[in-house]
């Protein structure tokens, strides 16, 4: 499941003169003890994005997960793209969260880089679930227009791909339009991305899920050496 999303990202990154990077075998593909859960990861970079990672978790009919995070290079104050998609096969429920995760909460910055999400939410009302906004910290790395969907099989089959393609394409378009920083300099951007990784490594809700499937040692290594690699960096 979700191969079309991964392939779309790969093509989009290649169009930016990007490339796939080699990662360690234990992160490329890892199985839990009875192989009921399999995790696969990919890592890309381009001149515009220092790190663009993709994760797929295959739990068969019970659970399917897709996650991607894009980090612009330190010369760009653009937000970090984040997407989490979970399909619970037993209950036939879809949970998805898409956001352009801002480096700062300044009003002008948010409007310039994140407000186009509002257009997507209005076009696809299923991704405008205000009742679930308590699941994130709005004062940290989330925009006021974070897109949240709690849907069903119809939303999975009919809506998800179209929304995801628009979400990614619009992110790339906005970042291409904003070549000159107005709010942050290089060192500030780097420090904000370090803060983001430290915050995410501590707060990531997938931590418990991964530990239950793959054990604590592998999960800690995965979080620090693949997901949030700036977690152990010191700020300048």
Swiss-Prot record:
Which keywords does this Swiss-Prot/TrEMBL entry list?
Answer: Oxidoreductase
Q: Name one Pfam family in it.
A: Fe_bilin_red
Question: Which reaction equation describes what this protein catalyses?
Answer: 15,16-dihydrobiliverdin + oxidized 2[4Fe-4S]-[ferredoxin] = biliverdin IXalpha + reduced 2[4Fe-4S]-[ferredoxin] + 2 H(+)
The protein's matches in Gene3D superfamilies, at most eight in alphabetical order, are given as:
3.40.1500.20
Extract the InterPro entries matched here.
DiHydbiliverdin_OxRdtase, Ferredoxin-dep_bilin_Rdtase
Q: Which GO terms describe its molecular function?
A: 15,16-dihydrobiliverdin:ferredoxin oxidoreductase activity; cobalt ion binding
Q: Has UniProt tagged this entry with the keyword Phosphoprotein?
A: no
Please give the family membership noted in the entry. Answer: Belongs to the HY2 family.
- The protein depicted here goes by the name 15,16-dihydrobiliverdin:ferredoxin oxidoreductase
Q: Which organism is it from?
A: Prochlorococcus marinus (strain MIT 9515)
């Amino acid at each position: 499941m979700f191969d079309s999303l991964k392939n779309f990202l790969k093509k989009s990154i290649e169009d930016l003169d990007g490339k796939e990077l080699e990662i360690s075998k234990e992160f490329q593909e890892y199985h839990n003890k009875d192989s009921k859960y399999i995790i696969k990861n990919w890592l890309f970079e381009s001149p515009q994005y220092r790190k663009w990672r993709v994760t797929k978790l295959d739990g068969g009919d019970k659970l399917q997960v897709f996650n991607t995070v894009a980090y612009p290079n330190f010369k760009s104050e653009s937000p970090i793209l984040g997407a989490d998609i979970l399909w619970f096969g037993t209950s036939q429920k879809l949970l998805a969260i898409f956001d352009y995760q801002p480096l700062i909460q300044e009003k002008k910055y948010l409007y310039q880089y994140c407000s186009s999400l509002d257009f997507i939410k209005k076009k696809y009302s299923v991704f405008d679930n205000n009742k679930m906004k308590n699941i994130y910290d709005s004062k940290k790395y989330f925009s006021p227009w974070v897109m949240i969907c709690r849907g069903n099989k119809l939303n999975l089959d009919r809506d998800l791909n179209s929304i995801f393609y628009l979400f990614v394409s619009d992110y790339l378009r906005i970042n291409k339009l904003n070549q000159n920083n107005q709010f942050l300099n290089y060192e500030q951007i780097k420090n904000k991305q370090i803060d983001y990784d430290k915050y995410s490594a501590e707060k990531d809700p997938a931590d418990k899920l991964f530990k239950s499937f793959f054990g604590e040692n592998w999960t800690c290594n995965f979080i620090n050496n693949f997901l949030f690699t700036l977690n152990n960096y010191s700020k300048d």
